[in-house]
UniProtKB/Swiss-Prot annotation:
<comment type="subunit">
    <text>V-shaped homodimer. Interacts with CDC16. The mammalian APC/C is composed at least of 14 distinct subunits ANAPC1, ANAPC2, CDC27/APC3, ANAPC4, ANAPC5, CDC16/APC6, ANAPC7, CDC23/APC8, ANAPC10, ANAPC11, CDC26/APC12, ANAPC13, ANAPC15 and ANAPC16 that assemble into a complex of at least 19 chains with a combined molecular mass of around 1.2 MDa; APC/C interacts with FZR1 and FBXO5.</text>
</comment>
<keyword id="KW-0498">Mitosis</keyword>
<feature type="compositionally biased region" description="Polar residues">
    <location>
        <begin position="73"/>
        <end position="85"/>
    </location>
</feature>
<keyword id="KW-0597">Phosphoprotein</keyword>
<keyword id="KW-0833">Ubl conjugation pathway</keyword>
<keyword id="KW-0131">Cell cycle</keyword>
<dbReference type="GO" id="GO:0070936">
    <property type="term" value="P:protein K48-linked ubiquitination"/>
</dbReference>
<protein>
    <recommendedName>
        <fullName>Anaphase-promoting complex subunit CDC26</fullName>
    </recommendedName>
</protein>
<comment type="similarity">
    <text>Belongs to the CDC26 family.</text>
</comment>
<comment type="pathway">
    <text>Protein modification; protein ubiquitination.</text>
</comment>
<keyword id="KW-0539">Nucleus</keyword>
<dbReference type="GO" id="GO:0031145">
    <property type="term" value="P:anaphase-promoting complex-dependent catabolic process"/>
</dbReference>
<dbReference type="InterPro" id="IPR018860">
    <property type="entry name" value="APC_suCDC26"/>
</dbReference>
<feature type="coiled-coil region">
    <location>
        <begin position="7"/>
        <end position="36"/>
    </location>
</feature>
<comment type="function">
    <text>Component of the anaphase promoting complex/cyclosome (APC/C), a cell cycle-regulated E3 ubiquitin ligase that controls progression through mitosis and the G1 phase of the cell cycle. The APC/C complex acts by mediating ubiquitination and subsequent degradation of target proteins: it mainly mediates the formation of 'Lys-11'-linked polyubiquitin chains and, to a lower extent, the formation of 'Lys-48'- and 'Lys-63'-linked polyubiquitin chains. The APC/C complex catalyzes assembly of branched 'Lys-11'-/'Lys-48'-linked branched ubiquitin chains on target proteins.</text>
</comment>
<dbReference type="Pfam" id="PF10471">
    <property type="entry name" value="ANAPC_CDC26"/>
</dbReference>
<dbReference type="GO" id="GO:0051301">
    <property type="term" value="P:cell division"/>
</dbReference>
Length: 85
């Protein structure tokens, strides 16, 4: 295997501007979400993250990572296919 010299990375003005715009966008989204949480907090839903219910915690994690579990079928025909005996 050939070893090569490290590649030099240069920070350009365009990169800095892009970073700043993305950071500002994320900050505005965070503020909007906090505002919604404060308004929704009067209903008592603001403490969902502090809930000790394992189902809601699992559901929050699944929502965060984008996992949507599919229910498993319980009948035998779905386990073994449609075999005729």
């Amino acid at each position: 295997m050939l070893r090569r010299k490290p590649t030099r990375l240069e920070l350009k003005l365009d990169d800095i501007e892009e970073f700043e715009s993305i950071r500002k966008d994320l900050e505005t989204r965070k503020k909007q979400k906090e505002d919604v949480d404060i308004v929704g907090g009067s209903d008592g839903e603001g403490a969902i993250g502090l809930s000790s219910d394992p189902k809601s915690r699992e559901q929050m994690i699944n929502d965060r990572i984008g996992y949507k579990p599919q229910p498993k079928p319980n009948n035998r025909s779905s386990q073994f296919g449609n075999f005729e005996f």
